[in-house]
Amino acid sequence: MTKSALQIARAAYQPKVPAALKGAVKAVDGEYTQSVADQDEIKKLFPNTYGMPVVTFEKSNEKKELPAMNVGVILSGGQAPGGHNVIAGLFDGIKANNAASRLYGFILGPGGLIDHKYMELTADIIDEYRNTGGFDMIGSGRTKLETKEQFDKGLEILKELNIKALVIIGGDDSNTNACVLAEYYKATGAGVQVIGCPKTVSYTHLT
């Protein structure tokens, strides 16, 4: 595909990175959290993940050799700006820590996790989508993760690929999926971290 001068210039742009994430960092636990309302009810629903501390990242002079890790990523719900750059940032981050790390994208949203449809995201693929809009790199979907059978089916492929962290990018419904999945995997000792990344055009995660 022939690229225009604008496309080439746009791809070369380097997004701004917080100072704390430049170079070595350390994670610092802060105060324990609680919901704005209905604390008791929510704690009953999420007994293993409710009330976790705020984590901040600070610069560190300590440099560690980190082991390679495999990470999965899902684009979920309606398209929103920045989805591709979240994936690019994940790729750059895990590769900077250890070049042997791998990033896997699940195709067409949460359904790809359940149906075991995925692709390894390489530098060649990532570079085609840097600084572009849409959720086109791996596609998106609106499958809700809400049953034990779905959770267990997803865990099968996560274990097969030796994935230790799963990032779900989307709006409020998508991050609800992430919460429910994280609670189940924590309760069962699955050994998979689930991270929700807010990404929406409707600001529903702020309401």
Feature locations, PLM:
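N-terminal phosphate-binding or glycine-rich loops at protein starts, especially the Walker A/P-loop
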Residues: 1-15, 65-114
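Short coil/turn connectors at secondary-structure junctions
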Residues: 66-71, 98-101, 132-135, 161-165, ...
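Short glycine-rich or small-residue beta-strand-to-loop segments that form or flank ligand, phosphate
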Residues: 70-80, 136-141, 164-170
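Short Gly/Thr/Asp-enriched flexible loops that form oxyanion-binding sites at enzyme active sites
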Residues: 86-90, 173-188
